[in-house]
């Protein structure tokens, strides 16, 4: 879809209340005329395929033309997905059961599929793993994920409840290394590492908050960029309310300047995983670091463009598009 086609689609499906709320928000921030802001948002849509959400989230109202050109907007992100990801192979990422089957050697933990006739298998699994992680097979952003303690007394009740709630993926609880776990012990704090054309273009540490089980940014979690070259967190962590943190707000553990252990090994691991399905060239990988090394939690066939280039994480207002373009223009290294 071209720029004009994308803009027309966005206009016809737009939430106009949120659009004008965005205009008022920006007006309160920089006191510019609302009519000017209106046309500036439209201009960003035409030139950069940016919606009003991009305009607000990435503070494009404070960026000049050169800086705006570097932002991976929603429209640009959609175009990259369309170019690099073959729809026939999306099932291996959208469906968590299909993902676990295809990437089993990268999981390093036990798992099973729940069906209406495998209660005995479920009992055997929970004898070995009395605490389990349960997931819907096709939900995103941590929805429906729960950690459950199973006993002989409640095993059948839990089995029936999981069938009723359509949470068919049962996994051994993932474990993580001490350096990452101590940041927020009740959640598995994963690294979201994005590959494009078999190269790493973005890396973030996602950290749980408020004793939640999941670390997702949209579930009150924190996100902190990892320097791809060094493996060091060299910017403050941020939450979805734009609060920034040098230390974790609950555990008081230091986040800024944390060195991710085994970083070079993690990068090799992710690049190798990115080669498993060549037809899917743009993927967001959720990676956990255990004591013995990295392993996959899951992966996303439609990486969001939201946390890569937030204002507190940009240098001189420059977004991620130059790095993405470099990866797209570069032939795979042997």
Model feature map: region roles:
Residues 17, 247-268, 275-282, 289-334:
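C-terminal active-site "lid" helix and adjoining low-complexity regulatory extension at the edge
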Residues 97, 116-122, 142-146, 175-188, ...:
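Domain-scale recognition of functional cores that engage charged ligands
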Residues 110, 132-158:
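Glycine-rich phosphate-binding loop of ATP-grasp-fold ATP-dependent ligases
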Residues 150-239:
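Phosphate-binding site of ATP-dependent enzymes
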């Amino acid at each position: 879809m071209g720029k004009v086609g994308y803009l027309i689609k966005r206009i016809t499906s737009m939430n106009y209340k949120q659009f004008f709320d965005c205009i008022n928000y920006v007006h309160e921030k920089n006191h510019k005329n609302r009519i000017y802001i209106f046309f500036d948002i439209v201009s960003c849509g035409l030139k950069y395929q940016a919606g009003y959400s991009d305009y607000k989230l990435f503070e494009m109202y404070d960026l000049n033309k050169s800086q705006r050109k570097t932002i991976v907007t929603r429209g640009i992100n959609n175009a990259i997905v369309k170019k690099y990801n073959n729809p026939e192979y999306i099932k291996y990422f959208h469906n968590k059961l299909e993902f676990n089957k295809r990437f089993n050697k990268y999981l390093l933990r036990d798992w099973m599929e729940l069906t209406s006739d495998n209660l005995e298998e479920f009992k055997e699994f929970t004898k070995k793993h009395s605490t389990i992680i349960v997931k819907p097979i096709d939900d995103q952003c941590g929805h429906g994920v729960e950690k459950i303690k199973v006993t002989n007394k409640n095993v059948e009740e839990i089995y029936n409840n999981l069938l009723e709630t359509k949470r068919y993926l049962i996994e051994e609880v993932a474990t993580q290394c001490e350096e990452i776990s101590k940041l927020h012990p009740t959640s598995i704090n994963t690294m979201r590492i994005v590959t494009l054309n078999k190269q790493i273009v973005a890396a973030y540490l996602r950290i749980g908050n408020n004793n939640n089980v999941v670390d997702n940014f949209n579930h009150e979690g924190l996100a902190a960029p990892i320097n791809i070259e060094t493996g060091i967190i060299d910017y403050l962590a941020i939450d979805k309310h734009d609060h920034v943190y040098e230390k974790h707000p609950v555990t008081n553990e230091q986040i800024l300047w944390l060195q991710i252990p085994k970083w070079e090994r993690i990068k090799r691991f992710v690049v190798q995983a990115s080669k498993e399905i060549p037809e899917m060239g743009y993927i967001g990988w959720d990676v956990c670091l255990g004591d013995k090394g990295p392993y996959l939690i899951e992966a996303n066939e439609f990486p969001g463009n939201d946390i890569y280039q937030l204002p507190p994480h940009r240098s001189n207002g420059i977004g991620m598009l130059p790095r993405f373009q470099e990866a797209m223009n570069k032939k795979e290294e042997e």
